[in-house]
Amino acid sequence: MLVHIPNVLTPEQVSMLRDRLDRAGDAWVDGRATAGYTGAPVKRNQQIAEHSPVARELGDVILAALERNPLFISAALPNQVYPPLFNRYEGGMTFGSHVDGAVRVLPNGVKLRTDVSVTLFLSAPDEYDGGELVIEDAYGVQQVKLPAGDMIVYPATSLHQVTPVTRGVRVASFFWVQSLVRSDAQRALLFDMDTAIQRLNASGADTEACRSLVGCYHNLLRIWSET
């Protein structure tokens, strides 16, 4: 399940993050530092050092925005969110096809299962050529290039890549979510049900029927969730 979440950040927030990242200097390091065994050979980009002050400061801005975003909560059903990271592609940089590692270690040593991968775009599409996020899923190959401030949420099990950036600079944040529901198929069903419930409520549909659907939703979540 791929979900496009628009306007996660305001234009003012995007501008602030870009300004801080553009002035980050030595905090930008070789992106291979965080790649796994199979990812490192095909990864050519730069990242903000994972535990640097700028990464924590800007990551907190994103985490606060996620807490206020009902579409993200509905789609990802977050249990734990990995602190957001930041990357930059320019001058032909790319990240070849790979699958994200199954487990990440949080700063406090707790292990996080990567159920959901997230990319938050911080560059406008007309700022760069190339740089599409290409995701292979059960429905084929999806190419993603979103407005600055928009986000794509997709299963971490997906084979994906970032195509070479041939002009300009592509800046983004990326991170992972351990969901309350590890199965993508189950999350997709719950997301569709939640979306339908919201539409029925907005249309003034029969409230008793809506209450019944809400009960079904929460009972399925109770069966499938892991806390």
Swiss-Prot record:
Protein keywords: Dioxygenase, Iron, Metal-binding, Oxidoreductase, Vitamin C
One GO BP on record is:
intracellular iron ion homeostasis
What InterPro entries does the record point to? Answer: Oxoglu/Fe-dep_dioxygenase_dom, PKHD_C, PKHD_hydroxylase, Pro_4_hyd_alph, Pro_4_hyd_alph_FE2OG_OXY
- Binding sites annotated in the UniProt record for 2-oxoglutarate: R170
| Documented EC number(s) | 1.14.11.-
What GO molecular function annotations does the UniProt record carry, in alphabetical order? 2-oxoglutarate-dependent dioxygenase activity; iron ion binding; L-ascorbic acid binding
SMART domains registered for this protein in UniProt: P4Hc (SM00702)
Q: Where is the Fe2OG dioxygenase domain?
A: 80-179
Gene3D superfamilies with a match to the protein in the record: q2cbj1_9rhob like domain, Rabenosyn, Rab binding domain
Cofactor binding remark: Binds 1 Fe(2+) ion per subunit.
Q: What are the binding positions for Fe cation in this chain?
A: H98, D100, H160
Required co-factor(s) are: Fe(2+); L-ascorbate
Per the UniProt entry, the signal peptide is none
List the PANTHER family hit by this protein, alphabetically.
PKHD-TYPE HYDROXYLASE YBIX
Q: What is this protein called?
A: PKHD-type hydroxylase BamMC406_5004
